[in-house]
Amino acid sequence: MNAVSDLRALHAAQPGWQAALSLGFERRGARTVLATRRHVGPLVVQRALYPEGDGVCHAIVVHPPAGIVGGDALRIDVDLGAGAHALLTTPGAGKWYRSAGARGSLVQRIAVGDGAVCEWLPQESIVYDGAAGDLATEVDIAGDGVFIGSEMTCFGRSGAGERYTRGDFAMRTRIRRDGRTLWLERGRVEGGGALLDSPVGLAGWPVTATLLVAAKTVDAALLEACREVPAEAGEGAATLLPGLLVARYRGPACEPGRNWFNRLWTLLRPPLAGRAATLPRIWHT
């Protein structure tokens, strides 16, 4: 069963929003098309966009409730066929609201076919004080596929002076190529816990973010180019693993981290995806 049929079976029986979105992209001639689109509940893509021409399909994943609360269970499945190129983002910050006890969850599964390029670039997630949630991302790449993905999380509404003092938020990310694990990370941030202030954690900053670039052609020259790009506030660093470039940010707000990632993306996209970087218009609204 796929994500949509699974959620249909559970939709009536579970509390909270039970939502699923399944997207399939295919290369047809010189054009990438959104060939399949199924959803249950309030999780949708309204239409395919082509601001860069036919070769790259942009899709904006919309969750009309605008946030996740305890008891919500969301799942997104994205499948890129061989040679397809898709960029997926969100219309604004995702929110994980305070929980009365139940946990919310978001599972993201992405399959990248041989020669395909998936750019998974959601806007930041804000974890409210008292939120309890689980975020899991699974990426499976075939052959020479390329994955460029980012995840940015702000613990507490820092703009309102709120800190994350209660609740807990668990994150898990795995990337595999042809069944071989390139990256596996698990973490849990507890409200008021030591990790928020530890120098090996957030070091007192509210925002943490990771940019993961999986490509067979990523090399030391690209790493050095990324290291030449400073973060305007907070701390940014990059490293190279076999077949994977990893950039980390922690800092006082989402905007400087987002700006740093955008500059890295501008460097990395032409050699890895064959196109100059063009920021999605939705990021400016």
Swiss-Prot record:
Keyword Chaperone attached: yes
Stretches assigned to coiled coil: none
A GO term, aspect molecular function: nickel cation binding
Alphabetic keyword roster: Chaperone, Cytoplasm, Nickel insertion
Major localization listed first in the record, in broad terms: cytoplasm
Record note on quaternary structure: UreD, UreF and UreG form a complex that acts as a GTP-hydrolysis-dependent molecular chaperone, activating the urease apoprotein by helping to assemble the nickel containing metallocenter of UreC. The UreE protein probably delivers the nickel.
Protein name per Swiss-Prot or TrEMBL: Urease accessory protein UreD
Annotated organism of origin: Azoarcus sp. (strain BH72)
Gene: ureD
